[in-house]
């Protein structure tokens, strides 16, 4: 993902020797902690008992860019070794693209040379690198007092109630502040797992204390940058901000956010636009919702084709799959948002220097 100041590149494959990330643009002198990074990575493991049986330690091996606990300003390279890999099953289906996966288009794009085991480079395994990049971005945001919190808004047919910002930010539940809804969400995931199926959902993410003036029109649009970044997360199929698609059923008098003055600051009485107007932050909380499709790997029989025999066949997958990837996506969504906001903040500093 390439920003104006910051960028990161993911490398590796799900069943290769390892995966990782190279991050550029992080300023020197930022204090970081191996323990903090590991704690952030632990969140990616999801709800205990409801995630894949594949157990990777996710121990970050810092190759460069960190010295004596501080960023050096040079590229940060982080490696994660793959320790719990079983590729035997994938040899049986290498010519039979799995429905819902990138197997077929990847085979066409890379002329059949791609690593197909466990999804290869398209696997959710690589999101460990996104969370890592997000950790360093969050360290930048800390200096500005910006906080980001993602939670599960919906799993299948179960949706959390409308929550206040205070409820979202102060909740001790790492997955959803609505405890009653969360219990039903867990039941929904367990039901899908028992039936050999999977279930999708929605993650809502909020960023508070974001200063006004970040972004710009067209190419500098921060909303467009966020949406583009969210869509880079595996399994994302929809993104909306503020009221999102609900604005289509309302009138301008209902959607427009009136300006008021509170504690000497200009704010809006409502936040239907989700903190962005004209591609520029308003100073109000940025609110986005991201829709994730159900895990495409399921245990039920599915129709596909045998590309070698060129005939239609039925497959029944074996392996270790998540009944829902939504709980594991929370730190990934936060990481993506943090990276985009940090990039715009650093770019804004360049503007401020030029105008001073």
Curated annotation (Swiss-Prot):
Task: Please give the pathway this protein is involved in.
Answer: Metabolic intermediate biosynthesis; chorismate biosynthesis; chorismate from D-erythrose 4-phosphate and phosphoenolpyruvate: step 7/7
Q: What is its EC number?
A: 4.2.3.5
Q: What role does this protein play? A: This reaction introduces a second double bond into the aromatic ring system.
* Assigned protein family: Belongs to the chorismate synthase family.
Q: What is the protein name for this chain? A: Chorismate synthase
Binding, FMN:
121-123, 278, 293-297, 320
Listed SUPFAM superfamilies:
Chorismate synthase, AroC
Chain sites annotated for binding NADP(+): 44
Q: Which domain of life is it from?
A: Archaea
